[in-house]
Amino acid sequence: MNNFKKRAGGPDIIRVLATLLVMTTHSIAYLGPMNVDIHTPKWTAYLVVRFAALSCVPLFLLLTGYLNRKKKLEKGYFRGILPVVISYLIIAAFSVICTNIGGHTAFGVADSIRSVFDFTANGYAWYVEMYIGLYLLIPFLNILFEHLGTFRNRMLLCIILVCMTMLPAAVESFRVGGVALDIIPEYWEAAYPLGYYFIGAMIGEYQPKIKKRYSIPMALIAILIPSGLCWLYSSPEAGYAWYMMNGFSCITTGAMAVTIFLVLYDIEPPKPVAAVFRELSTCSFEMYLFSYPADLFLYSQTSYFMPFMVLTVFAMSYAAARVMRLVMVPLVYRRLKGR
């Protein structure tokens, strides 16, 4: 009961915000092809919103490092991944049924089973695939973090990881004579989750404070630089400039996510507000996966103002996640425990 009372409100707010931002990025993708002329007022606004929403996955990863930096390699640790796996299996099976009924994809029995285990049953399951691997590594990452010992050593690790995993995407965005500036090795770019994990661990360990008057300008700069450059480099003839700082593994996205995290992580909202965010945060993983069938259904039926669509998907996903957590997950756990 004491742990419940002491639960911080900031991480719950971050998790709910990240869930909303995920749904926002998907909404923009469903509302139209990005190869349209983005220089119209509507698509210019969508472009800025999209770059802001790219902080969604980095926020989740920062939060993982922030909350898990003390986890140790001990008995029972690896059982902790079971809720994630069980939730995924249930929602993946539900997604297969929905895609077959809705006519989006025709799966046979064998293909349906295979799609669950190769993480293609749910279009957003790549995150589950990534998170399982990260979870298995967490105790070992924490050993490294702990034995580095000093702030200087830990900061040096974070700087090296940022240079290896986030800087290449920014540098190669610029082109001379149509040739990308691949002057920084990009081999380790896919390891960006490690960079975010350790940055989150640093924030949790040292609890840095950011002056609020600086946070908004910093976040705006991190949003407007990549979105402005993407706007300039895109054209109706050449299409959308996908190469221009698009993605989670870009230093501008990282700067934006870290700024948002630093603003929110130590917030303590009033108890009624904290209770709402706690409830939504508890269901956020399932909401993320349930948003896939919700997106398929909603965007195949209609297309309204984007905020309305995002909030509708959010509400549908929460309802589905709450039903699953109240009914299906307890039944599965009782089976596993032989009750």
Locate each region found by the language model.
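Hydrophobic residues within membrane-embedded alpha-helical segments of Major Facilitator Superfamily
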Residues: 14, 21-24, 59-61, 196, ...
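Specific transmembrane alpha-helix
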Residues: 54-72, 127-143, 170-211, 249-269, ...
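Alpha-helical transmembrane segments and terminal signal-anchor/GPI-anchor hydrophobic tails
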Residues: 190-193, 208-275, 301, 306
